[in-house]
């Protein structure tokens, strides 16, 4: 069984007020924070690195941390980097809860999955729009999550690509218990497409951080996903 998860992308936040912005979206109903790490090599943009994650972890403790009364969240680190193997340990040390690497960035994805899991966090694999979904079929049984990009990775604020939804549908059909994430252009207008295809983890940047009513946007997207999962008999009974 899977559950609906909304993961606001901090790439769309006001970095001058990152702690406050993250607390706001968590208080509005977000369980995860999606942290886009770009190195200027695998993708043309450069965003943030381990020091930011380390500092943000102090501001946003892990779920289950009973020593802090601050809003808590799961850190979903989307690693748009060359040679992702080199970055596993440092991101684990600095607070990552999940390490999502790109299939296109590694020569041995299964060994990388094993490395990530050996460090005690979740392993996920992402594919670019031009990458066929079937490359994930052999790897998926070892993954905690698969990510189907619905924009070209590298920059926020791009237009949603609905033609990526057959990839999501194919993954959901073959792996009904797998967390399946979509990333790029998600908001109120596009969430029905993602939910219907079978995605349960929704990355949303501008549509959440720039919303006048963040709780309304998050609830709307979560409800769409929840209704579809329930209709398929896949909804986590705890929801």
Curated annotation (Swiss-Prot):
Record has Iron as a keyword: yes
Required cofactor names: Co(2+); Fe(2+); Mn(2+); Zn(2+)
GO aspect biological process, one term: carbohydrate metabolic process
Catalytic activity: D-ribulose 5-phosphate = D-xylulose 5-phosphate
HAMAP family in UniProt: RPE
Cofactor: binding details: Binds 1 divalent metal cation per subunit. Active with Co(2+), Fe(2+), Mn(2+) and Zn(2+).
Annotated binding of substrate, by residue: 9, 78, 154-157, 183-185, 205-207
Pfam families: Ribul_P_3_epim
Cellular component, GO annotation: cytosol
Protein name listed in UniProt: Ribulose-phosphate 3-epimerase
